[in-house]
């Protein structure tokens, strides 16, 4: 398919719009749940946490090869690079990584290592759906201006709304998953266009 000059530009607003729409839907649904159920469950009842010490990467220079283990941070960068260290890799399944100082968090469903001890690794207790808690934490827009650890003293005691029926939670999480998949498809399409553009430009004057 021929590329028009504006193909990539058209994709970027679409992705931004999808993300904004996802956030709006999430906030609407969680506000409705909170209004109906009230603040009825503590984070400490829902999540276990693990210190990341054993999963901290030894090397400070990372690789670009995606075949190796990603090194993660909870901030916007998320994947800092990759390591070929074959030991002490977190591979216990889905978790939330939360920066104890900035309160940034990410939902992770692949094996990884981390950069620093500032991370808390959070996993669900019993039949709690982790995706729901992750979305709720983002819904709260957690922010801090204090350089200290927050999770144990402030986040764990926090009350949030959690439906009595897991069916309602599953419906909410499924909705979030559908938006994620749509955004992922559009992102892949954008990357494909960029690769095609770069290829054409590199061969234009050969």
What does each model-identified segment do?
Residues 42-163:
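DNA target-recognition domains and sequence-specific DNA-contacting regions of bacterial/archaeal
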Residues 16-77, 185-195:
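Non-catalytic DNA-recognition/assembly elements of restriction-modification systems
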Residues 203-206:
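Short hydrophobic/aromatic patches at helix-to-coil boundaries
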């Amino acid at each position: 398919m021929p590329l028009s000059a504006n193909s990539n530009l058209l994709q970027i607003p679409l992705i931004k719009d999808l993300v904004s729409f996802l956030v709006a839907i999430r906030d609407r649904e969680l506000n409705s749940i909170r209004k109906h159920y009230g603040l009825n469950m503590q984070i400490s009842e829902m999540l276990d946490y693990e210190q990341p010490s054993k999963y901290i990467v030894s090397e400070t220079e990372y690789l670009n090869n995606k075949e190796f283990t990603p090194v993660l941070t909870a901030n916007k960068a998320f994947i800092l690079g990759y390591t070929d260290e074959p030991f002490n890799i977190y591979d216990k399944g889905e978790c939330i990584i939360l920066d104890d100082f900035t309160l940034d968090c990410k939902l992770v469903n692949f094996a990884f290592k981390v950069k620093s001890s500032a991370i808390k690794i959070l996993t669900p207790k019993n039949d709690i759906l982790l995706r729901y808690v992750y979305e709720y934490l983002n819904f709260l827009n957690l922010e801090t201006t204090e350089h200290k650890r927050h999770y144990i003293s402030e986040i764990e005691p926090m009350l949030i709304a959690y439906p009595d029926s897991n069916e309602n939670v599953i419906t909410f999480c499924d909705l979030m998953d559908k938006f994620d998949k749509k955004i992922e498809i559009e992102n892949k399409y954008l990357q494909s266009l960029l690769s095609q553009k770069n290829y054409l430009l590199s061969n234009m004057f050969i």
